Curated annotation (Swiss-Prot):
Residue positions binding Zn(2+) 1: H69, H71, H162, D183
GN (gene name): YSH1
The family this protein is said to belong to: Belongs to the metallo-beta-lactamase superfamily. RNA-metabolizing metallo-beta-lactamase-like family. CPSF2/YSH1 subfamily.
Native species: Candida glabrata (strain ATCC 2001 / BCRC 20586 / JCM 3761 / NBRC 0622 / NRRL Y-65 / CBS 138) (Yeast)
GO molecular function, one term: 5'-3' RNA exonuclease activity
The protein's name: Endoribonuclease YSH1
């Protein structure tokens, strides 16, 4: 699957978990980066058939693999990917997930294999214990809320609330943010917090759809119903089988039962009705729950602090590794893994207890299509034996389903999706019918946005179907180095607080209003900062750096400074060249003046090289000696423009009319000619010329007020009208100009004031005499 590296196409590809629950594995690609999300197995199948469709994708191009949590349908094929394929990327999961994953996968290798029905089972396993150990050492851990950057792929883990260590990942590539929820829960239960909403917005949301549009009962109602079902069954002498995953929901259910048994000691306690947890992993993983108790909710942490004992050391629950330790006499409650009843202790107990009508099988988790747990919910008359499928066992026991699966229901999912507010939603981890109903419900919910910029697109791709979405990430440049201080100084100059000591309340309010107007004007105009924008195409970073900091912050960049040099033949005196340069440019520094051309020395040097060296606008060095003018400067946009202007002056200085007039004063003979004296332009004419410049710049926002003497005016009025006024009004910003003195009288906007003063300076130069 080829993806153009600089394309704006976001590609989503499910290798598993598309329109199904099980073997979750998704690929996302953007800007040449590839991320794999989860690597599970399908609990309804065995061996190679349980794997995601890895053959349909080149795993060698995967940069990062993120595991959301330790459940087998999300993590069990990870050792296969790392040891049996051409995968070369890095693998990340949270600390609790890695701690539990080790024990869970070791048990999976022991219990489940591709060749469980064959004599060569060990050779046919998906992977061995050695593969598991070797791959385990390569897995990297990530803390919640810490951002990891892997070659331009930035991702952050947030609490998902599904099981201990479960995480949802917000991934950012080139400004595009993708949120992958994994399995998540928005309900605060007895030991876990609810899933978090990331603070930063996401453009694409990949979200589970396990329960579709179904709605859960309130948790307290479910707990009450659970204890009532169990209590009534054991009171009648029956046994209760609760198939559970070894870790996760099992601990939640045990917290409920342990508390209930303690509250009903007379009837149930003191081993009258025993509770067993049949799992080889229980004791091994108990230390993990002890270690990470501070990652759980306030309720469990409070119990830990108050009692100084681990809440997961249960008083009324005993652990057994296998059925050889179990004395099956009288009523009891058994929590046994695996949760899908495909094999193991839970399947053995099912076959033993299902013929007795007094017994109860209580399904508390989600049942995947094709598993015994799902089949049992149909209440069949018989079930096949796991050791010999041709042998059937009568089913007379009761079967009840009471979901304690830590997955969101429709209302919780909808509220979360609305908070994320992504423009594209991709549904995963759901059977076709529930997922289809959820898609229809979401489209109906967002129907009012259809055809607008805020339209929300909902996708439910099947496995091995390529979904392409046109996306454009938001590019944000980060200022680094000295440029940061320059930006701060500029911001301070835009809005400078005035000294408000002794101001009245009205004065303070007026100043505050003016400050807000200035800020608005500054935001509109924008402060101009000169810097270099450096783009790291590999990591998708944009940095604003000053030229002086370039080598420090980007040593990988090579910089080149180009010096320009131009030589021009001139046939005029240095005095004339200097005069023209001074008339054109305001910043002219004299570096060397051997002949005192600039009249800056009291006497001329006795021995002169005849050299005149000028520094013009701080950028151009002009050397005039004999009949040659040499220009030297560092190449740049502004310096090149100034150099072009100087060259134009030097090329025309000897033929310009003003040069003839200027040089004619030095003639040796002096006689007067009757030449008419031309009238000089009046001050009013000059003001009108400058006012015309303002009219061109500001249009109808500018008004010129020419005061005329009136015999009826009082002395005070005549004194006020001594200067010609100009008024500029732009929204709430005003500027009053004194054209007589060519200055700004009053202005409530610093940016506007700066612009007016610049125009006044240009106007003064424009009407000033060249002679």
């Amino acid at each position: 699957m080829d993806v153009k590296e600089r394309s704006n196409q976001f590609r989503f590809f499910s290798l598993g978990g598309g329109n199904e629950v099980g073997r979750s594995c998704h690929i996302i690609q953007f800007k040449g980066k590839t991320i794999m999300l989860d690597a599970g197995i399908h609990p309804a199948y065995q061996g190679m058939a349980s794997l995601p469709f890895y053959d349909d994708f080149d795993l060698s191009i995967v940069d990062v693999l993120l595991i959301s949590h330790f459940h087998l349908d999300h993590a069990a094929s990870l050792p296969y990917v790392m040891q049996k394929t051409n995968f070369k990327g890095r693998v990340f999961m949270t600390h609790p997930t890695k701690a539990i994953y080790r024990w869970l996968l070791r048990d999976f290798v022991r219990v489940t294999s591709i060749g469980s029905q064959s004599s060569n089972a060990e050779d046919d396993n998906l992977y061995s214990n050695e593969d598991l150990i070797e791959s385990f050492d390569k897995i990297e851990t990530i803390d919640y809320h810490s951002m990891i950057d892997v070659n331009g792929i930035k991702f952050t883990a947030f609490h998902a609330g599904h099981v201990l260590g479960a995480a949802m990942f917000q991934i950012e590539i080139a400004g595009l943010r993708v949120l992958f929820t994994g399995d998540y829960s928005r309900e605060i239960d007895r030991h876990l917090n609810s899933a978090e909403v990331p603070p930063l917005p996401s453009d694409i949301l990949i979200v589970e759809s396990t329960f579709g549009t179904a709605t859960h009962e309130p948790r307290l109602h479910r707990e009450k119903k659970l204890t009532q079902l169990i209590h009534s069954t054991v009171n009648k002498g029956g046994r209760v089988l609760m198939p559970v995953f070894a870790l996760g929901r099992a601990q939640e259910l045990m917290l409920i039962l342990d508390e209930y048994w303690s509250q009903h000691k007379e009837e149930l306690g003191s081993n009258q009705i025993p509770i067993f947890y049949a799992s080889n992993l229980a004791r091994k993983c108990l230390s993990v729950f002890q270690t990470y108790v501070n990652m759980m909710n306030d309720n469990i942490r409070k119990k830990f602090r108050d009692s100084q004992t681990n809440p997961f050391i249960f008083k009324n629950i005993a652990y057994i590794k296998n059925l050889d330790e179990f004395q099956d006499f009288g009523p009891s409650v058994m929590l046994a893994s695996p949760g899908m009843l495909q094999n193991g202790l839970s399947r053995d107990l099912l076959e033993r207890w299902c013929p007795d009508e007094k017994n109860l099988v209580l399904i508390t988790g989600y049942s995947v299509e094709g598993t015994m747990a799902k089949y049992l919910l149909l209440e069949p008359d018989t079930i096949p034996s796991v050791s010999n499928p041709e042998v059937t066992i009568p089913r007379r026991c009761r079967v009840e389903e009471l979901s304690f699966a830590a997955h969101v229901d429709f209302q919780e999912n909808l509220e979360f999706i609305e908070q994320i507010n992504a423009s594209n939603i991709i549904l995963v981890h759901g059977e076709p019918n529930p997922m289809g109903r959820l898609k229809s419900a979401l489209l109906s919910n967002y129907a009012s946005f259809k055809g607008t910029e805020d339209e929300v697109h909902v996708h439910n791709p099947r496995n091995c179907y390529e979904l392409d979405i046109e996306c454009k990430g938001v590019k944000v440049a980060k200022a680094v180095g000295n440029i940061v201080d320059e930006i701060k100084r500029t911001e301070e100059e835009v809005v400078k607080p005035e000294n408000d000591a002794g101001q009245s309340k009205e004065g303070i309010e007026e100043f505050t209003g003016k400050t807000q107007d200035v800020r608005k004007d500054a935001e509109g105009e924008g402060a101009i900062i000169s810097s270099i924008l450096v783009s790291d195409e590999k990591n998708f970073d944009l940095n604003l750096v000053s030229l002086s900091d370039l080598r420090e912050h980007h040593p990988e960049l090579s910089t080149t400074v180009i010096r320009e040099r131009q030589t021009i033949q001139v046939d005029c005196k240095k005095e004339l060249i200097y005069w023209h340069i001074c008339q054109m440019f305001g910043d002219v520094s004299v570096l060397i003046d051997d002949d005192n051309v600039t009249n800056t020395k009291e006497t001329k040097l006795e021995t002169s090289r005849g050299m005149l060296v000028l520094q013009i606008m701080g950028a151009i060095r002009l050397t005039v000696q004999h009949n040659k003018a040499i220009l030297e400067w560092t190449q740049g946009l502004i310096s090149d423009t100034i150099a072009d202007s100087i060259i134009a002056i030097l090329m025309s200085v000897d033929s310009a009319p003003v040069s003839v007039k200027k040089s004619s004063n030095s003639c040796s003979h002096g006689h007067e000619h009757a030449t008419p004296i031309l009238s000089q332009p009046s001050e009013t004419d000059k003001i009108k010329q400058v006012a015309e410049l303002f009219k061109t710049q500001f249009g109808d926002s500018f008004t010129l007020i020419l005061n005329k003497d009136d015999d009826n005016d009082t002395a005070e009025e005549k004194e006020d009208d001594e200067f010609v006024k100009g008024l500029i009004t732009i929204g709430k910003n005003t500027a009053s100009i004194n054209f007589t003195d060519m200055c700004v009288v009053e202005c409530n906007s610093n940016p506007l004031k700066g612009r007016v003063e610049s125009l006044l300076k240009i106007g003064i130069d424009m009407v000033s005499s060249l002679c």
